C-alpha cells in the first residue's frame, strides 16, 4: 500500500514538471513581443543661419543693439526720425502683406485676423482681473517714461500691471509695491538683457494663473477698454498670438536639418515696441522652449531678440499663426497719420524720439504740446475725464 502511494506521488510529480515545462515553452510564442514605446518629444530649437538684425534689416533692431546713454532725463526715444512706417499698410485678413490695399480684401479668410476672430462664438467672459500686463522698463527711465505711465493708464490698472525692471528703486517700490519685479537682468539694451527680462515675464505670468499675457514697453499707452474688448473676442484656452509686425513680410531663415541638408523656415513676429498678447492656452504650449530659463537658451540658439524669439517659438516651432492687428502702435510708425476719430479706439499708442518729437498722435484741446509732448496725458483725460489732475471740461 505504501509502495503504491509512493509510486503515485512520483508519477504526479513528473506530470506536473512536464506540464510546467510545456507552459514555459508554449506561452512566450503566443504573446506579442514587447517593444519600447516612443513618446512624442518637444521639437528642439534648430539653429538659424540668420538674425533679426542685419540680415533682415528690421526697423529699430540694429538701433536696439546699441548701448543707450547712461544718464538721461529725456522721456523720448533715441531713433532715426526717418525710420517710420505707415500704419495704413496693415490690412486685416490679407494673405500677401506685400500687396497694400486701401480697402477690404477680396479673400479675408486666408489669413488669420482680428476681424475673423471677432465673430468667434466661444468668447471669454473676460474681466480686468484676468489680465497680466507686463511693462518692460529700465531703472534709468523710472522717473521719466515709467512715471508718466504710473500717472496715466497704470493708475487705472494697478492690480493688472506688473513692472519688470533691472534695478531696485525704493521710491518705485513704495508707489507700486509687489507689482514691481526686479529681474536682476543687465541694464544694457542688448539682446541678452532683453531676453532675460522676457524670460522672467513669461515665468511670472505662468505662476499668476491669469488668462492673458500682454507685453508692452515703457513708452506705450494702453487703452484698457480697447484691450479687454479685443481679448474678449477670443478664448484664452485657444492658441492666440495677437500683435503687429514691424515688417511687411515674415522672416525667412535657414533651419539646419541634421547634417544632410537645410530647410527654409518662415515666421511672423509681433514687435515688442507696439505690444502683443498671448493666451494662456498658447503660453502653456510654449513651456518647453520658454519656461524656467529655457527662453534664454532658445534665444541664444537662434540669436534673436526677445520679440523675434517669441514669434519663432509660436509660429516657427508650434505652427500657430499670429493674428495681425493694426490696433497696436510703436514709435517706429508715423503716428500723426492715425485718424483723430480712431485714436481713442486703439489698444496701444506710442511717441517719437528726441529727433522726431512731432511724431505723436494728433489729439489736442486739453494740454499744449509743450506741457504734454507725448500726448499721453491728453489721451488719458479724454478717456478718464474724472482724473484729479485733468482740467475740468468746458461747458457751453
Swiss-Prot record:
Highest taxon above the source species: Eukaryota
Presence of keyword Electron transport: no
UniProt tissue specificity: Detected in the mesanchymal region of the developing limb. Expressed in mesoderm but not in ectoderm with no evident boundary of expression.
Cofactor(s) the record lists: Mn(2+)
Binding site for substrate: 145, 218
Compartments it resides in: Golgi apparatus membrane
InterPro entries (UniProt xref): Fringe-like_glycosylTrfase
Entry EC number(s): 2.4.1.222
Location of the active site: 307
Molecular function in Gene Ontology: metal ion binding; O-fucosylpeptide 3-beta-N-acetylglucosaminyltransferase activity
GO cellular component: Golgi membrane
Cofactor binding notes: Has some activity with cobalt but not with magnesium, calcium and zinc.
Function text: Glycosyltransferase that initiates the elongation of O-linked fucose residues attached to EGF-like repeats in the extracellular domain of Notch molecules. Involved in forelimb development and in adult forelimb regeneration.
Family of this protein: Belongs to the glycosyltransferase 31 family.
Protein name as it appears in the record: Beta-1,3-N-acetylglucosaminyltransferase radical fringe
Organism: Notophthalmus viridescens (Eastern newt)
Encoding gene, per UniProt annotation: RFNG
Amino acid at each position: 500500500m505504501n509502495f503504491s502511494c509512493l509510486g503515485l506521488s512520483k508519477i504526479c510529480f513528473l506530470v506536473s514538471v512536464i506540464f510546467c515545462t510545456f507552459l514555459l515553452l508554449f506561452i512566450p510564442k503566443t504573446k506579442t513581443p514587447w517593444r519600447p514605446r516612443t513618446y512624442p518629444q518637444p521639437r528642439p530649437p534648430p539653429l538659424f543661419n540668420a538674425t533679426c538684425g542685419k540680415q533682415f534689416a528690421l526697423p529699430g533692431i540694429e538701433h536696439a543693439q546699441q548701448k543707450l546713454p547712461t544718464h538721461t532725463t529725456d522721456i523720448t526715444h533715441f531713433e532715426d526720425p526717418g525710420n517710420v512706417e505707415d500704419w495704413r499698410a496693415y490690412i486685416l485678413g490679407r494673405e500677401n502683406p506685400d500687396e497694400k490695399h486701401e480697402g477690404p480684401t477680396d479673400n479675408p479668410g486666408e489669413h488669420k485676423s482680428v476681424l475673423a476672430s471677432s465673430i468667434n462664438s466661444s468668447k471669454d467672459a473676460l474681466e480686468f482681473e484676468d489680465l497680466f500686463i507686463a511693462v518692460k522698463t529700465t531703472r534709468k527711465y523710472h522717473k521719466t517714461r515709467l512715471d508718466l505711465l504710473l500717472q496715466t493708464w497704470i493708475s487705472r490698472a494697478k492690480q493688472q500691471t506688473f513692472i519688470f525692471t533691472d534695478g531696485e528703486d525704493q521710491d518705485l517700490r513704495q508707489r507700486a509695491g509687489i507689482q514691481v519685479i526686479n529681474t536682476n537682468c543687465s541694464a544694457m539694451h542688448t539682446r541678452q538683457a532683453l531676453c532675460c527680462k522676457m524670460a522672467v515675464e513669461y515665468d511670472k505670468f505662468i505662476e499668476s494663473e491669469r488668462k492673458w499675457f500682454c507685453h508692452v514697453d515703457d513708452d506705450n499707452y494702453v487703452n484698457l477698454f480697447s484691450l479687454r474688448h479685443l481679448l474678449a473676442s477670443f478664448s484664452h484656452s485657444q492658441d492666440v498670438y495677437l500683435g503687429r509686425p514691424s515688417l511687411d513680410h515674415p522672416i525667412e531663415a535657414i533651419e539646419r536639418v541634421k547634417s544632410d541638408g537645410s530647410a527654409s523656415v518662415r515666421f511672423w513676429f509681433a514687435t515688442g515696441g507696439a505690444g502683443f498678447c498671448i493666451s494662456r492656452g498658447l503660453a502653456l504650449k510654449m513651456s518647453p522652449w520658454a519656461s524656467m530659463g529655457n527662453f534664454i537658451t532658445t534665444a541664444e540658439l537662434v540669436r534673436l531678440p526677445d520679440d523675434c524669439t517669441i514669434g519663432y517659438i509660436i509660429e516657427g516651432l508650434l505652427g500657430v499663426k499670429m493674428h495681425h492687428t493694426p490696433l497696436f502702435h510703436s514709435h517706429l510708425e508715423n503716428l500723426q497719420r492715425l485718424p483723430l476719430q480712431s485714436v481713442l479706439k486703439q489698444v496701444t499708442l506710442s511717441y517719437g524720439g528726441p529727433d522726431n518729437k512731432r511724431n505723436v498722435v494728433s489729439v489736442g484741446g486739453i494740454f499744449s504740446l509743450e506741457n504734454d509732448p507725448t500726448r499721453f496725458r491728453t489721451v488719458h483725460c479724454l478717456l478718464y475725464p474724472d482724473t484729479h489732475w485733468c482740467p475740468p471740461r468746458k461747458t457751453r
